[in-house]
């Protein structure tokens, strides 16, 4: 599963890009 996170991805996840949600930039992590 993939998630949008702030401020960064959890250990073991990879960042594949960004998400824009609620006016903020989130890391897109899988």
Swiss-Prot record:
The keyword ATP-binding does not apply. PROSITE patterns: DEFENSIN (PS00269). GO terms for biological process: defense response to bacterium; defense response to fungus; killing of cells of another organism. Disulfide bonds join 2-30, 4-19, 9-29. It is found in: Secreted. InterPro entries: Alpha-defensin_C, Beta/alpha-defensin_C. One of its GO terms (cellular component) is extracellular region. Its main location: secreted. Keywords: Antibiotic, Antimicrobial, Defensin, Disulfide bond, Fungicide, Secreted. Pfam families: Defensin_1. Belongs to the alpha-defensin family. In low salt conditions, has antibacterial activity against the Gram-negative bacterium E.coli ML35p (MIC=2.4 uM), the Gram-positive bacteria L.monocytogenes EGD (MIC=2.2 uM) and methicillin-resistant S.aureus ATCC 33591 (MIC=3.5 uM), and the fungus C.albicans 820 (MIC=3.9 uM). At high physiological salt concentrations the antimicrobial activity decreases significantly: E.coli ML35p (MIC=7.1 uM), L.monocytogenes EGD (MIC=1.8 uM), S.aureus ATCC 33591 (MIC=>50 uM), and C.albicans 820 (MIC=>50 uM). This is Alpha-defensin PhD-4. It comes from Papio hamadryas.
């Amino acid at each position: 599963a993939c998630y949008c996170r702030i401020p960064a991805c959890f250990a073991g996840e990879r960042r594949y890009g960004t998400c824009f949600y609620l006016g903020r930039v989130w890391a897109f992590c899988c």
